[in-house]
């Protein structure tokens, strides 16, 4: 049994809280759509919706379904996704990294500090899970080494990915640093099975950078 992480393979607890709520709408059909994107050029997904639109709950559901730390079949066997042809193929087959960017932004004094803290926290959990394979503090090198040694791909879930553009709306240099990090982390990386990002702002270009030019 894997030890659950805060960011790496966080398990099913957050999603189970949603399931136990008085009002729960089964949106597991989303999983069939994301399953179809895995291993394709469309594996990078960005969902822009207003607050309170259920974006975080959807990310919790995806983390529970894809994450390999907990057998979540007992949960999903009861949901609509269980009838999909791809259901068993991807259930609990991936290492999941789930991040809420707002959490890191709120306790950071700059973009540089935020990105350093994010890497430190995630890589620390990667080292605990894969002590024999992670030799670097750089998140890209760490994940690439894990993939090279184990063949295991990652599903990366990022909530509030666009919070930087609200906080640093007039700081183009900060925006550029952030987008450069996202791109270097995710673009053309063999370890990425699926990247699913949620935000509030509409997708657009910031300066000369395309926010989702993956």
Task: Give the residues covered by each predicted segment.
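Phosphate-binding site recognition
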Residues: 1-214
């Amino acid at each position: 049994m894997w030890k659950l992480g805060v960011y790496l393979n966080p398990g099913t607890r957050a999603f189970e809280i949603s399931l136990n709520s008085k009002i729960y709408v089964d949106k597991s059909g989303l999983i069939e759509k994301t399953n179809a994107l895995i291993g394709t050029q469309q594996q990078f997904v960005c969902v822009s919706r207003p607050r309170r639109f259920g974006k975080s709950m959807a990310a919790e559901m995806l983390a529970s379904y894809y994450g390999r730390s907990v057998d979540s079949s007992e949960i999903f066997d009861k949901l609509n996704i269980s009838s999909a042809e791809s259901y068993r193929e991807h259930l609990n087959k991936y290492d999941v990294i789930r991040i809420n960017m707002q959490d890191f932004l709120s306790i950071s004094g700059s973009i540089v500090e935020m990105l350093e803290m994010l890497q430190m926290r995630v890589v620390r959990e990667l080292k605990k899970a894969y002590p024999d394979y992670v030799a670097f503090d750089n998140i890209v090198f760490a994940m690439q080494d894990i993939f090279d040694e184990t063949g295991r791909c990652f599903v990366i879930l990022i909530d509030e990915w666009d919070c930087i553009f609200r906080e640093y709306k007039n700081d183009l240099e900060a925006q550029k640093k952030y987008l450069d990090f996202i791109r270097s982390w995710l673009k053309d990386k063999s370890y990425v099975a699926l990247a699913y990002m949620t935000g509030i702002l509409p997708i657009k270009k910031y300066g000369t950078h395309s926010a989702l030019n993956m």
